[in-house]
A protein has these predicted regions:
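N-terminal small/polar loop signature for handling phosphorylated ligands or for N-terminal nucleophile
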Residues: 3-55
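Short helix-loop-beta junction
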Residues: 1-7, 115-120
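C-terminal charged capping/lid subdomain of soluble metabolic enzymes
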Residues: 309-317
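Short Gly/Thr/Asp-enriched flexible loops that form oxyanion-binding sites at enzyme active sites
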Residues: 54-73, 113
């Protein structure tokens, strides 16, 4: 079993959340007290959620004895790998039903999860940013089950609904987004930190039983599929003038897409604002002010205005070669990820 500790000062219910500047596990300072306690007690893992338990952040102890914060992309990739591996080892997903297994993620989430899903023989569906789009897919998969079979769907056990989905529809194995939101089941149709924390603890126990650290598991994924690194940048522009600048800047990428960046030719552009795209299942992708730019050297970036804040957001992606030792690949991919916008 696990020796579970909590941070006593953060156990007190207080809507002001006085122990942190922001109770958001995306922000490293939100985990500072827990990491300090982990160092004092010798704990190997820190798991933190936000107050409404939809986002989850994690820190793990490395071979150097220090705690390392994982990104939302890295946490999601470890969870995706563990789910896929478990489904195969338990015989739930096999050659007879593998074509019905699916992962659903957002376009701006790491390609490592695409690689993991495809390696396992699953369909990987990319959707727009926002968990509502993942939830829409889950609703679609439920509706594909014959009506007479799903009449009591909401009262069925996971085993019963899974059998129906594997026979008539799609079985959702894992989904998530880079902003620390994950989902591994169908009965909650939003990002769910509660179930994610349980699965991550199970993953940690698996790693311990295999004599590996979680960082070692992550590096094994990097060596198998290539090192994936992602970065995020935001430009904040407040007020009416700021909103106009954000709109103009966003529109400029569609009207005048770049031909090169950092002296590297652009190899492909995906403009989501036109509303003429479909996903791998043939479903229309709603028009969104987002553009994806792929460079000839393997880098790519996406640009989109935030839907909730006065900022324009950049998502930067770098990918190394499969099979390359992580220690050699990491510096190269880190350099590739530093796109100068």
């Amino acid at each position: 079993g696990c020796n579970v500790q909590t941070v006593a000062a953060q156990d007190v219910q207080d809507g002001r959340f006085p122990t942190v500047a922001s109770p958001n596990p995306e922000n490293p300072p939100a985990l500072a007290m827990a990491i300090e306690q982990a160092d004092a007690s010798g704990a190997d893992i820190v798991i933190a959620t936000d107050p409404d338990a939809d986002r989850m952040g994690v820190a793990v102890r490395g071979e150097d004895g220090k705690m390392h914060l994982l990104t939302g992309n890295q946490i999601g990739s470890l969870l995706a790998w563990y789910r896929c591996m478990s489904m195969s080892e338990l015989g739930i997903i096999n050659d007879s039903n593998r074509s019905r297994a699916v992962m659903v993620k957002t376009f701006v989430t790491t390609g490592l999860q695409d690689a993991i899903g495809h390696h396992c023989g699953y369909e990987v569906v990319n959707v727009l940013t926002g968990f509502k789009y993942i939830a829409q897919k889950l609703g679609k998969y439920e509706e594909a089950i014959p009506a007479e079979k799903r009449r009591d769907y909401r009262r069925m056990s996971e085993e019963q609904t899974r059998a129906l989905r594997l026979q008539y529809s799609r079985y959702f194995v894992f989904g998530g987004e880079e902003s620390y939101g994950y989902l591994a089941q169908d009965f909650v149709r939003d990002k769910d930190a509660n179930s994610a924390a349980i699965i991550f603890a199970e993953l940690a126990a698996y790693a311990e039983s295999a004599g590996k650290s979680l960082l070692e598991l992550l590096h094994e994924l990097f060596e198998k599929f290539g090192v994936y690194l992602e970065m995020g940048k935001s430009l904040v522009m407040e007020g009416a003038d700021g909103a106009a600048k954000i709109a103009a800047l966003s529109a400029s990428y569609s009207a005048n897409p770049p031909a090169e960046l950092d002296g590297v030719p652009v190899s492909g552009i995906r403009d989501f604002s036109k509303g003429d795209m479909v996903d791998v299942e043939g479903d229309p992708i709603p028009a969104e002010k987002m553009i994806f730019v792929d460079l000839a050297d393997g880098r790519s970036f996406a640009v989109r205005p935030s839907g909730t804040e006065p900022k324009i957001k950049y998502y930067l992606f770098g990918h190394g070669k499969p099979g390359e030792p992580v220690k050699e690949a990491l510096p190269k991919v880190q350099a590739l990820s530093l796109i100068h916008i």
